[in-house]
Amino acid sequence: MAKRTFSTLEAFLIFLLVIMTVITVALLTLLFVTSGTIENHKDSGNHWFSTTLGSTTTQPPPITQTPNFPSFRNFSGYYIGVGRADCTGQVSDINLMGYGKNGQNARGLLTRLFSRAFILADPDGSNRMAFVSVELCMISQRLRLEVLKRLESKYGSLYRRDNVILSAIHTHSGPAGFFQYTLYILASEGFSNRTFQYIVSGIMKSIDIAHTNLKPGKIFINKGNVANVQINRSPSSYLLNPQSERARYSSNTDKEMLVLKLVDLNGEDLGLISWFAIHPVSMNNSNHFVNSDNMGYAAYLFEQEKNKGYLPGQGPFVAGFASSNLGDVSPNILGPHCVNTGESCDNDKSTCPNGGPSMCMASGPGQDMFESTHIIGRIIYQKAKELYASASQEVTGPVLAAHQWVNMTDVSVQLNATHTVKTCKPALGYSFAAGTIDGVSGLNITQGTTEGDPFWDTLRDQLLGKPSEEIVECQKPKPILLHSGELTIPHPWQPDIVDVQIVTVGSLAIAAIPGELTTMSGRRFREAIKKEFALYGMKDMTVVIAGLSNVYTHYITTYEEYQAQRYEAASTIYGPHTLSAYIQLFRDLAKAIATDTVANMSSGPEPPFFKNLIASLIPNIADRAPIGKHFGDVLQPAKPEYRVGEVVEVIFVGANPKNSAENQTHQTFLTVEKYEDSVADWQIMYNDASWETRFYWHKGILGLSNATIYWHIPDTAYPGIYRIRYFGHNRKQELLKPAVILAFEGISSPFEVVTT
């Protein structure tokens, strides 16, 4: 056998892995006592649990309040409430969640992230549901449990685990750090209570606003296909599905968008909920700006259209663009190619003749990732706008819900009269480490790897222990890189207990799945639920998949796709029969709703809530201004004059933006203001939620930093005199005293914008 050699990157990563493991084990030994660190969040009764060790935010025990509900009366329609709130969290000193790329930390803000809540209730108030679309990569179990606890403390039994869905849009440009399972905490470089609290507060605020705004209204539904925004990023895996099944569909991606139009009884617009299958990865893994990617841009455009005269994130109309079965769907429609040669990649392995898998990348339709995001997002928005305008089929019928917690590591699946199979403890395969054509890993591991590597296997066994024969056999043909389901220090590395949930609104069934279904998985999943409803009398149901809901469990491929072990299959953590298990579980929910036997269903084993988590590995240090300068001072002024289409760039003496996430009243890092002669004052025209602005933080040494604000002047900008303001918070630390966070601001010199 030839001697094994490693690239410089691989050798460095091996060294880094060993060092990190030694440090982690030492820290865990010192910091954690695993006994007595698990709490269960119940959905009835009052209780209070410590959020985390070293929490930066403390709260008093909740006091159950009697909410002021609308005075319900009979009418044809539903009570409808919509709400939106900021849930951005940290925009610095934290990993961006999604690509898993080392060093892809947040360094600023392209646009704020929002939680959008939609409450739909029967006219008599007997039943209701809350669907919350959150601009995050995924929903963590910890987020959901905390939100449910706070909802119970404020609203009693009105909003519960069965009628509240939290669904993430899956942007790969949002902050990490809000998880409780060890694998995700390590990927986040620790737990950020600052970000966790910010997100929870944003979700809660959006629900509070929707609850307060409940009013009589009507719901209309529409569907249509979206063209020129998707490709299947694992087409060779898709082809492994039966030809007879593939022949039923015209494409290897789901092109259908489903739209709900929400209006009051006078026909005035209230909001929109849209579900569509696409990965928000138009912003690639070189990005360091927090943003909501293509689906967030679609929501931004729709809300700006409906909320004329309001700044982004403000105004009464709320547009939620939610995720669906996006597992193998990419927006990078120019497809994969070898970036060093321009050649086509190998289709099965996504690798290149020269440079290997790290050179095989897909690209979007724009000149850069920003333009690609705009192009894809605008097409999605335009289709949603068209479907919204023409929606005429009214949704009628009761609001119903069913939910269970399930141990996904031990589900017996009856395939047919003679064959029963089981799910597995979680494990990730080798191809998980390869990444995808949307974001390659840099390691010399290819997609479609069906055999392990002796070196990596030995290194894993020495550091983490050897996978059991049981998990190896159960996960076949997956070669196990990480047997996460057998790792429990300091806490389990991936979840065992997950949520399965269906909420129906009339003839619409929303199936909240805790993961990423591939295209064909989603088709089988929807079809099975629809048939189950029909079997028990609820015919002609429309089933929509709400992806990445309630807890994250990676991917869900078909059994056939699993055999190829590309990225999505290697990331199907509960083994080859994961999809069959979910179909069986959701059929049970559909049957219970259709037969009015939900009350007879077991709630299932409650998920844990871990109290003591690994704190952020990035320390808090005091901010400093250069000698002779103050925070907010201008270092690089604006030019006296700009034309429409040019970019204004102003640099200020800055401070770490994560300080602002601790301030509950902080609303923006910047404003672009125009002087109005008619009122002799400055008027805000843009803020940091505007896609025309960018806020970038340059981290220096010893607490020094700069903040650069960019304004890309749009064609719609009015000529006149403008200025840019910067709002920040600096951390001040005096000897033997607790740190304090102080607000400051900076103002640029005025400049003129001209049209010619």
From Swiss-Prot:
<dbReference type="GO" id="GO:0006915">
    <property type="term" value="P:apoptotic process"/>
</dbReference>
<keyword id="KW-1015">Disulfide bond</keyword>
<keyword id="KW-0472">Membrane</keyword>
<dbReference type="GO" id="GO:0044241">
    <property type="term" value="P:lipid digestion"/>
</dbReference>
<keyword id="KW-0735">Signal-anchor</keyword>
<feature type="glycosylation site" description="O-linked (GalNAc...) threonine">
    <location>
        <position position="58"/>
    </location>
</feature>
<keyword id="KW-0812">Transmembrane</keyword>
<keyword id="KW-0325">Glycoprotein</keyword>
<dbReference type="Pfam" id="PF04734">
    <property type="entry name" value="Ceramidase_alk"/>
</dbReference>
<feature type="binding site">
    <location>
        <position position="688"/>
    </location>
    <ligand>
        <name>Ca(2+)</name>
    </ligand>
</feature>
<feature type="disulfide bond">
    <location>
        <begin position="338"/>
        <end position="352"/>
    </location>
</feature>
<dbReference type="GO" id="GO:0007346">
    <property type="term" value="P:regulation of mitotic cell cycle"/>
</dbReference>
<feature type="topological domain" description="Lumenal">
    <location>
        <begin position="33"/>
        <end position="756"/>
    </location>
</feature>
<dbReference type="GO" id="GO:0005886">
    <property type="term" value="C:plasma membrane"/>
</dbReference>
<dbReference type="GO" id="GO:0006670">
    <property type="term" value="P:sphingosine metabolic process"/>
</dbReference>
<keyword id="KW-0496">Mitochondrion</keyword>
<comment type="pathway">
    <text>Lipid metabolism; sphingolipid metabolism.</text>
</comment>
<dbReference type="GO" id="GO:0008270">
    <property type="term" value="F:zinc ion binding"/>
</dbReference>
<feature type="disulfide bond">
    <location>
        <begin position="345"/>
        <end position="360"/>
    </location>
</feature>
<dbReference type="GO" id="GO:0005901">
    <property type="term" value="C:caveola"/>
</dbReference>
<feature type="topological domain" description="Cytoplasmic">
    <location>
        <begin position="1"/>
        <end position="11"/>
    </location>
</feature>
<feature type="glycosylation site" description="N-linked (GlcNAc...) asparagine">
    <location>
        <position position="444"/>
    </location>
</feature>
<dbReference type="GO" id="GO:0006672">
    <property type="term" value="P:ceramide metabolic process"/>
</dbReference>
<feature type="binding site">
    <location>
        <position position="279"/>
    </location>
    <ligand>
        <name>Zn(2+)</name>
    </ligand>
</feature>
<dbReference type="GO" id="GO:0005794">
    <property type="term" value="C:Golgi apparatus"/>
</dbReference>
<feature type="glycosylation site" description="N-linked (GlcNAc...) asparagine">
    <location>
        <position position="193"/>
    </location>
</feature>
<keyword id="KW-0479">Metal-binding</keyword>
<feature type="binding site">
    <location>
        <position position="110"/>
    </location>
    <ligand>
        <name>Ca(2+)</name>
    </ligand>
</feature>
<protein>
    <recommendedName>
        <fullName>Neutral ceramidase</fullName>
        <ecNumber>3.5.1.-</ecNumber>
        <ecNumber>3.5.1.23</ecNumber>
    </recommendedName>
</protein>
<dbReference type="GO" id="GO:0016020">
    <property type="term" value="C:membrane"/>
</dbReference>
<feature type="site" description="Cleavage">
    <location>
        <begin position="74"/>
        <end position="75"/>
    </location>
</feature>
<feature type="binding site">
    <location>
        <position position="555"/>
    </location>
    <ligand>
        <name>Zn(2+)</name>
    </ligand>
</feature>
<keyword id="KW-0333">Golgi apparatus</keyword>
<dbReference type="InterPro" id="IPR031329">
    <property type="entry name" value="NEUT/ALK_ceramidase_N"/>
</dbReference>
<keyword id="KW-0862">Zinc</keyword>
<feature type="active site" description="Nucleophile">
    <location>
        <position position="330"/>
    </location>
</feature>
<comment type="similarity">
    <text>Belongs to the neutral ceramidase family.</text>
</comment>
<keyword id="KW-0597">Phosphoprotein</keyword>
<feature type="glycosylation site" description="O-linked (GalNAc...) threonine">
    <location>
        <position position="64"/>
    </location>
</feature>
<keyword id="KW-1133">Transmembrane helix</keyword>
<feature type="binding site">
    <location>
        <position position="516"/>
    </location>
    <ligand>
        <name>Zn(2+)</name>
    </ligand>
</feature>
<dbReference type="InterPro" id="IPR038445">
    <property type="entry name" value="NCDase_C_sf"/>
</dbReference>
